[in-house]
Amino acid sequence: MKNGIDFVETEAYARIYNFILMVDDSIKNSEQRQSKHHMDVLADITRIVSETEKDPSPQRYANMAAKTVFKKIYDTYDDEYLRNSFGNQIRLDYGTGHELNFLCYLYAQYCRGSIGIDCVFTILVKYFEIVRLFITKFNLEPAGSHGMWGLDDYQFLPFLFGSSELCNTTLRFDELDGSKCYFVAVEKKLGGSSRILKSIMDKDWASINRGMIRMYDDHVLRRSVVTQHFIYGEYLRKDRSQANKDL
């Protein structure tokens, strides 16, 4: 970064990484609850996506009516993390940086006391569903793709937290159904086939989960192409983290 401090050295990185571990632990060890307010927000965004008609003219890439969806979200909500959680309104694309914005939105909500840590997963599952609807309906472009060497051209967290949900089970993948986040993520994967997903199919869920956390850190949080436009704020500051100050 131009100011001499890399994202992984910031307080924001330390906090969001710790938040991931907290959510992971909650999914494994606590009954998950719903937050009516946040589910209502996502239901409203689902309505916006569903009711916005596609542009009927020939479209080479993303359908231009997606701009209408972005405008409605921007006009309805003023939270910068939430506004930027559904893609880029100029490029009409979506990727893990936008997914990270939604995680940051939930972190800020958690810090304000608006949600408990045991509400995060249920909100995320609904968010994943909306994103898939938005991408498939309006043909949003992937904001960076690893092709067959990646998990998914658009999303990562459904696999990470989906594996958290399965760590205390002995279920094999072929025994899963649509009630499990990981199964839905694989079945509705956006993009081509994934060699990584195939290679880990026979591993135990705890191993898959640990690998997903490491991979998310390496491929999302530590990638400047993802974090170069990170939105810093009250709870996710650009200050150097205490751990790095002590080095």
From Swiss-Prot:
Record organism: Encephalitozoon cuniculi (strain GB-M1) (Microsporidian parasite)
Family to which the UniProt record says this protein belongs: Belongs to the PTPA-type PPIase family.
GO biological process, one term: mitotic spindle organization
PANTHER family: SERINE/THREONINE-PROTEIN PHOSPHATASE 2A REGULATORY SUBUNIT B, SERINE_THREONINE-PROTEIN PHOSPHATASE 2A ACTIVATOR
Keywords: Cytoplasm, Isomerase, Rotamase
Protein name: Serine/threonine-protein phosphatase 2A activator
UniProt GO MF annotations: peptidyl-prolyl cis-trans isomerase activity; protein tyrosine phosphatase activator activity
Superkingdom of this protein's organism: Eukaryota
Catalytic activity: [protein]-peptidylproline (omega=180) = [protein]-peptidylproline (omega=0)
Subcellular compartments: Cytoplasm
GO cellular component, one term: cytoplasm
EC number: 5.2.1.8
Function in brief: PPIases accelerate the folding of proteins. It catalyzes the cis-trans isomerization of proline imidic peptide bonds in oligopeptides. Acts as a regulatory subunit for PP2A-like phosphatases modulating their activity or substrate specificity, probably by inducing a conformational change in the catalytic subunit, a direct target of the PPIase. Can reactivate inactive phosphatase PP2A-phosphatase methylesterase complexes (PP2Ai) in presence of ATP and Mg(2+) by dissociating the inactive form from the complex.
